Structures are given as structure tokens and as C-alpha cells.
UniProtKB/Swiss-Prot annotation:
Keyword NAD assigned: no
Compartment(s): Secreted
Signal peptide per UniProt: 1-22
Subunit details: Heterodimer of a small subunit and a large subunit processed from the same precursor.
Biased composition (Basic and acidic residues): 672-684
Official protein name in the record: Aculeacin-A acylase
Organism, scientific name: Actinoplanes utahensis
Annotated segments matching region Possible recognition-sequence of an AAC processing enzyme: 220-239
InterPro entries per UniProt: Ntn_hydrolases_N (IPR029055), Penicillin_amidase_A-knob (IPR043147), Penicillin_amidase_dom1 (IPR023343), Penicillin_amidase_N_B-knob (IPR043146), S45 (IPR002692)
E.C. designation(s): 3.5.1.-
One Pfam family of this chain: Penicil_amidase
Active site: S230
The protein's role, per its UniProt record: Catalyzes the hydrolysis of the palmitoyl moiety of the antifungal antibiotic, aculeacin-A, giving a hexapeptide moiety and a long chain fatty acid.
Length: 786
């Protein structure tokens, strides 16, 4: 060996990184000191790390190290937010709502929320377990090890190089970011309303509306799931060519920030061996597979919080009655540091939770206020649950994990196993609003709101209207497993963010509490397309060879980019604009529809890179498809059918508006010309389309008039098509925005380019599959002491 190589190896050992050039060492080989951390990292193509360790602490160490290598700026920024320091470093105003987020995070710190989560619940399932605690500590140590040996000023990512807000992590930092994720769809979506809640003044409203407008409330609460969605298939033996279980995972998540996924394969020999993806900053696989079972998640329609209407004490708007006795709210003033000085806000808490407002609907008046109970606020079970899911051998064992831990904060589960059995379940954390409680405790003016939306407003003046406890629930206040919708099938289950009702069209799930979602109602265009794709594939009528699914056929279906809205109404729309070639836009302009009509007549009803006219149809649909036909509960996949009320003037107005907003001539621009994503100076063509248009492969990239759609905001992110065959799992994966946010990383844009051409990375799970990777790089990270 050359002396230069020996010097390089010595330097690597000094930094705690050993590069293996030949035989792969065991994770603990050459461990510097008993009780330290050591992990073996094998980087495969596209930077995907396969991490092996002897225990969960060292596994977390490896995860923290590689995630810091690839995304240290994202993790550091999320920690700043969770610690109530966002306003200080990023300003008090702007698109991040830094002031609101900082104030809320500071309140959570003052309340010792994360510390109390680590103490575990007073009653219910004990969590987090020792393995998870070890893994979190290890993650922190691995992140800090990378930062210490690299140095803030030598980071290669310009987004945080040399920034004062990049610092070593503590264990509590990581638990705070986890808590932020738990409450995302509950109190996290109501931050504005919680921060804005102040006692009434003489100038405020005297009373709240007696009959709240359900549509107005829905609009005000629209942020509860903004920016996230998903599709998933669980295919059983009757749906696959080989009779094995198969899963398609297709979460739709933001392309920037802490909610990006990160691909990895984690292994503690004999205890845990799971490949898939997790959100950046999380130490455990959240969507993925082991040798015999695979799973994905889709965003559930169930509600995560309930309102309590408070009857206030006359003359004292910060006191309320419970069973005829007054109780005082607890006022807490929180002061945060911003770039321009300190800012103070006062929060008001009740026995139910914080007071919140939705102006014009849920106002704080001299007589009435509203408090919320977020049932995820005490959810410390998530990482325990995902860890145990990864150890399940089949979908029945997986369901047992879900039943015991009830940890999923706001998602369904769709799974399949090597025996060919598929599972759907909404095992998410849901407030315990049973039919009996709703009937007895939702005041009459709020009953229509609950029936239409599942938003429950309970009578806060009665203690018997509290959420109570189910005997089989993991913790009090949530629906137990016996009240949740579950379906096992040997053909298929699916979900695309509608409710549980049609997870299996052959066996609809009905009779569940309204708070979980609606039943026997029209499904979204994306749900209908997802079901139609499966049914056509099983019948062999989709234009692809044969019948049934292989992973190759599943990939083709996933990226077929059908636009179901266009399939249903394009011909009628073309006929209409040919009969009436001019229309008045909503701004009063008279628009010639001739060119648009020609483009739509040639549109292939897909969102492929070479599809022309897709953007025009997408903008038209922003005005809403209007069916004259009715929904048939016995035919939910195909109704409402495409029968238009062509006399409705809004149809032609919507088309005129689409023409006005079109980035250029609809007859000359393809999806690949105008749907792009930036990677430095490079603009990568992006296929896919809006979910509202009935596109399965969702890509949301806002229109910039005169330019096109230059930046993806959210959509298809991690995609997995995996088959659980007799020789182990096989299939395809991709992470659309790539592993790293660092523009100087080799893994900054490689998978985005791969996605653009509908390519894939082959799943590598077995030792033989990993060893065969042509780009494999092996190294070990270690640290003395813990």
C-alpha cells in the first residue's frame, strides 16, 4: 500500500470514518471503545444508504450521520423552528409564518411538551420503548459527529454554511420536531387561530352565529392537509401474476423542506431489516418493506381534533361553566425573540385544550368561546409503532401492531404480504366521537356541520360530553380498534385520500362514526381513476399485455399519466366550443376559443412530457367539472358520468379563463416545455398533473402567467412498487426530488432526471442485490463512548 493511502486511512480513522475497499467489515469491527457507536454504511446507486449496526443506538447513529451528510441544512432549520427560534433567524413575517410558528413552538417548550412525552402517558400504552430511545440518541450522536468533524464553516451546502443557527443537536430537539409532525393535521393547522385568540373587547362581536356555515369553516380549516396527499395499492394473490402480495406506495408530499422523504435500508441483524423511506430527520422507516410484508400510507379523511363550545361567565370572558360551576382559563404569556426585538403573545388554556378562533364562525364573544382537543398532542407512540411494523411477518401481525399502538397520526395503512393477503385500515388517531356522543353532545346548530364535514363541536359546559375512553384504545380520548375500518382481501385494497368507504369496492366499509369520513358519497376523480386502473389491469383492457400485475406493469400503470377528468368530459367540451367558438371570461374579455378547441381535440388525455393541451385542460378544471348526471351509490367508480349541462354559462367562462391564463399557444406547448423543476441553472421537464384533474401521478406546480409551471411545490415523491416473492422482495423505487438538498451533492438531481424519463432504481434488499450494485461505496462510522 502507498504511504499516501495509509495517511488517508489514518485521517479517516481519526475522524471516525473508515472506508472499506475490499471485504465488508462487520459494523462493530475495530470498535474503538466498548459502549460506543459503530455503523456500517454501504452507499448504493443514487446515494441510497444501506446501514447495518449491532444495536438500535448504533443504527440511529448511522442514520443521523448519513442524513446530515445529505440534508444537514434541512434538519438544522427544522430544529430552529421546533425550538421557537424561527423568527430570530428567519424574520417575523413571510411565507413561513415565522412569527406564528415561533410563538407556538415557544409555548410548547414552556409547557415541556416533549419532556412530558418522554415521561409516557399516565394511562395507556407505555412509550417510547428503549429501542426507540436508543435510536433517537444515536441519531443525535451521528448528526453531531458529522457536524463536529466537518465544521459549520466547511459545510458544502451554501444554504447553511457558516450560519449561526446550525449547531449540535440534543435529544430533546429531535423529539420536538417529532411532536410538530404529530400535530400537523390538528392544532398545527390551527396555529393562526390559537395565536389570534384574545378575550373580547367592546368592539368585538357580541355573539357567535347560531348556525355556522359549513363551507366557510371548511375553507378556514383547509390547511389541515394542505400540501400532502397520496395513492396506494395493496395487491393480493388474485391481482398479481405470481400470486404474491404487492404494494404501490405513492405519497404526495412537499418537494422542499422537512417533509421531504429520504430513502434508506436499515438493519440490526436478527432484529430489524427494513428498506424504504422516512421523512428527513426521522430515524426509522415509515413507508417500506421487510422480507415478507410491505406497507404504505395515505392521508386519512378522519378529523384530528374536536371543538368544545364554552359558555362563559357573564362579565368574565376568561371563565367558563362546567356542570354549572365556573372554571378559569389559564393565561400564559410567551415572549419570543425576533430579528427586530421581542414579541409577546398570551395564550388561554382550558381543561379541553387551547382556545382558538375562526373569525366570523368560531369567535370569542362575551358569551361564548371555543377550545380544541388535539388527540395527537400526546402521541409519543409513532416511532414505536413504525419500528414494530417493520418487524411484522405478515399483514395480520401488522394489524396487531396497529391495534396495540394506535400511533398513526393522520394516515391510513395499505399493505400486502408474501402470502398474497392485502390490508386496508384507517388506524389513525381519531377523537372518540361515537354516534351516541354526537347525538347527545353536539348542539343542534352544529349538527349539520358534523353531518356534512365530520367537524365535531361538543358542548363544553357538560363534563359528560368529554371524549371519554374506549376499553380497547391505546390511550383515553380516541376511538379504539373495534371502531375503526379495516379490510383484509386477496384481490386488492386501495386509497387515494377519500374516506375508508371504497377501499375495496367489492366490500365497502360502512357504518362507522362520521368523524372518520363520509360513506356512500361521490369519490374524487383521482380515486375513481385509481380504481379504474386496477379493474382494467385485472381485465386486461388497459392496452398493456396480459392480465394482472407484475412490478413492471404496476410501474407502467403508476406513470401512465392518465387525466381522468379529460377522459370523461373532453369530447363534450370540444363539441361545445366548436358550436360556440367565443366566450366571455370572468374579467369581461371576449375570448376566441378556436385555437383552444383545436388543441383540446388533439389532446391525448394524458400528462406525459409530449402531451399538448394538458395545461389548458388543467386550468379549465380550476373552474370545476359540472356533471348534470347524478351519483349512483351502486356504481361509484363510473358516476357521476360525463353528461354536461351545456347551457351552464360557467363552462364556457371557465374555458375562456383558461385561455387567458395559458402560458402560450395551447397548440404548440407540451407538458415537457412548460412543466419543469429547477436544479441550479438546469430546468428538468416534469410529467404528471393536478389531482383535481383526475391525474394519479400528482404534480402540483403553480402557473406563472406567461411562463408556465417552473417549480414543483408538492406531489409524487417516494414511489415504491414492490413484490414479496418466495426469494425475497423485488421491484422498483424512485425519490423524485433525489436524496440531497445540497446543490453540491452528486445526489442532488440524479433521481429527478431519472423520474423525468420514467426510469427507476431497482430495489436492493438482499446481500446479493446490494453487492451487485455497480456504484457501491462502503464505509464505517464510529464514535468512542455514548
Amino acid at each position: 500500500m502507498t504511504s499516501s493511502y495509509m495517511r488517508l486511512k489514518a485521517a479517516a480513522i481519526a475522524f471516525g470514518v473508515i472506508v472499506a475497499t475490499a471485504a465488508v467489515p462487520s459494523p462493530a469491527s475495530g470498535r474503538e471503545h466498548d459502549g460506543g457507536y459503530a455503523a456500517l454504511i454501504r452507499r448504493a446507486s443514487y446515494g441510497v444508504p444501506h446501514i447495518t449496526a449491532d444495536d438500535f443506538g448504533s443504527l440511529g447513529f448511522g442514520v443521523g450521520y448519513v442524513q446530515a451528510e445529505d440534508n444537514i441544512c434541512v434538519i438544522a432549520e427544522s430544529v430552529v423552528t421546533a425550538n421557537g427560534e424561527r423568527s430570530r433567524w428567519f424574520g417575523a413575517t413571510g411565507p413561513d409564518d415565522a412569527d406564528v410558528r415561533t410563538t407556538s413552538s415557544t409555548q410548547a417548550i414552556d409547557d415541556r411538551v416533549a419532556e412530558r412525552l418522554l415521561e409516557g402517558p399516565r394511562d395507556g400504552v407505555r412509550a417510547p420503548c428503549d429501542d426507540v430511545r436508543d435510536q433517537m440518541r444515536g441519531f443525535v450522536a451521528g448528526y453531531n459527529h458529522f457536524l463536529r468533524r466537518t465544521g459549520v464553516h466547511r459545510l458544502t451546502d451554501p444554504a447553511c454554511r457558516g450560519k449561526a443557527w446550525v449547531r449540535p443537536l440534543s435529544e430533546i430537539d429531535l423529539w420536538r420536531t417529532s411532536w410538530d409532525s404529530m400535530v400537523r393535521a390538528g392544532s398545527g393547522a390551527l396555529l393562526d387561530g390559537i395565536v389570534a385568540a384574545t378575550p373580547p373587547t367592546a368592539a368585538g362581536p357580541a355573539s357567535a352565529p347560531e348556525a355556522p356555515d359549513a363551507a366557510a369553516i371548511a375553507a378556514a380549516l383547509d390547511g389541515t392537509s394542505a400540501g400532502i396527499g397520496s395513492n396506494a395499492y395493496g395487491l393480493g394473490a388474485q391481482a398479481t401474476v405470481n400470486g404474491s402480495g404487492m404494494v404501490l406506495a405513492n405519497p404526495h408530499f412537499p418537494w422542499q423542506g422537512a417533509e421531504r422523504f429520504y430513502r434508506m435500508h436499515l438493519k440490526v441483524p436478527g432484529r430489524y431489516d427494513v428498506e424504504g423511506a422516512a421523512l428527513i430527520g426521522d430515524p426509522i422507516i415509515e413507508i417500506g418493506h421487510n422480507r415478507t410484508v410491505a406497507w404504505s400510507h395515505t392521508v386519512s379523511t378522519a378529523r384530528r381534533f374536536v371543538w368544545h363550545r364554552l359558555s362563559l361567565v357573564p362579565g368574565d370572558p376568561t371563565s367558563y361553566y362546567v356542570d354549572g360551576r365556573p372554571e378559569r382559563m389559564r393565561a400564559r404569556t410567551v415572549t419570543v425573540q425576533t430579528g427586530s426585538g421581542p414579541v409577546s403573545r398570551t395564550f388561554h388554556d382550558t381543561r379541553y385544550g387551547p382556545v382558538a378562533v375562526v373569525p366570523g364562525t368560531f369567535d370569542w364573544t362575551p358569551a361564548t368561546a371555543y377550545a380544541i382537543t388535539d388527540v395527537n398532542a400526546g402521541n409519543n407512540r409513532a416511532f414505536d409503532g413504525w419500528l414494530r411494523m417493520g418487524q411484522a411477518k405478515d399483514v395480520r401481525a401488522l394489524k396487531a401492531v396497529l391495534d396495540r399502538h394506535q400511533f398513526l397520526p393522520w394516515v391510513n395503512v395499505i399493505a400486502a404480504d408474501a402470502r398474497g393477503e392485502a390490508l386496508y385500515g384507517d388506524h389513525s388517531v381519531v377523537p372518540r366521537v361515537t354516534g351516541a356522543l354526537a347525538a347527545a353532545c353536539i348542539p343542534a346548530p352544529f349538527q349539520p356541520l358534523y353531518a356534512s364535514s365530520g367537524q365535531a363541536v361538543l358542548d363544553g359546559s357538560r363534563s359528560d360530553c368529554a371524549l371519554g375512553a374506549d376499553p380497547d384504545a391505546a390511550v383515553p380520548g380516541i376511538l379504539g380498534p373495534a371502531s375503526l375500518p379495516v379490510r383484509f382481501r386477496d384481490d386488492y385494497v386501495t386509497n387515494s385520500n377519500d374516506s375508508h368507504w371504497l377501499a375495496s369496492p367489492a366490500a365497502p366499509l360502512e357504518g362507522f362514526p362520521r368523524i372518520l369520513g363520509n360513506e356512500r358519497t361521490p369519490r374524487s376523480l383521482r380515486t375513481r381513476l385509481g380504481l379504474d386502473q386496477i379493474q382494467q389491469r385485472l381485465a386486461g383492457t388497459d392496452g398493456l399485455p396480459g392480465k394482472g400485475f407484475t412490478t413492471a406493469r404496476l410501474w407502467q400503470v403508476m406513470f401512465g399519466n392518465r387525466m381522468h377528468g379529460a377522459e370523461l368530459v373532453r369530447d363534450d367540451l370540444v363539441a361545445l366550443c366548436r358550436r360556440q367558438p367565443t366566450a366571455t371570461a370572468s374579467n369581461g374579455a371576449i375570448v376566441d376559443l378556436t385555437a383552444a378547441c383545436t388543441a383540446l381535440s388533439r389532446f391525448d388525455e394524458r400528462a406525459d412530457l409530449d402531451s399538448r393541451g394538458a395545461h389548458l385542460f388543467t386550468e379549465f378544471l380550476a373552474g370545476g367539472i359540472r356533471f348534470a348526471d347524478t351519483f349512483e351509490v351502486t356504481d361509484p367508480v363510473r358516476t357521476p358520468a360525463p353528461f354536461w349541462n351545456t347551457t351552464d354559462p360557467r363552462v364556457r367562462t371557465a374555458l375562456a379563463d383558461a385561455c387567458n391564463g395559458s402560458p402560450a399557444s395551447p397548440s404548440t406547448r407540451s407538458v415537457g416545455d412548460i412543466h419543469t423543476d429547477s436544479r441550479g441553472e438546469r430546468r428538468i421537464p416534469i410529467h404528471g398533473g393536478r389531482g383535481e384533474a383526475g391525474t394519479f401521478n400528482v404534480i402540483t406546480n403553480p402557473l406563472v402567467p406567461g411562463v408556465g409551471y417552473p417549480q414543483v411545490v408538492h406531489g409524487t415523491s417516494f414511489v415504491m412498487a414492490v413484490e414479496l416473492g418466495p426469494h425475497g422482495p423485488s421491484g422498483r423505487q424512485i425519490l423524485t426530488y433525489a436524496q440531497s438538498t445540497n446543490p453540491n451533492s452528486p445526489w442532488y438531481a440524479d433521481q429527478t432526471v431519472l423520474y423525468s424519463r420514467k426510469g427507476w432504481d431497482t430495489i436492493k434488499y438482499t446481500e446479493a442485490q446490494i453487492a451487485a450494485d455497480p456504484n457501491l461505496r462502503v464505509y464505517r462510522v464510529a464514535q468512542r463512548g455514548r
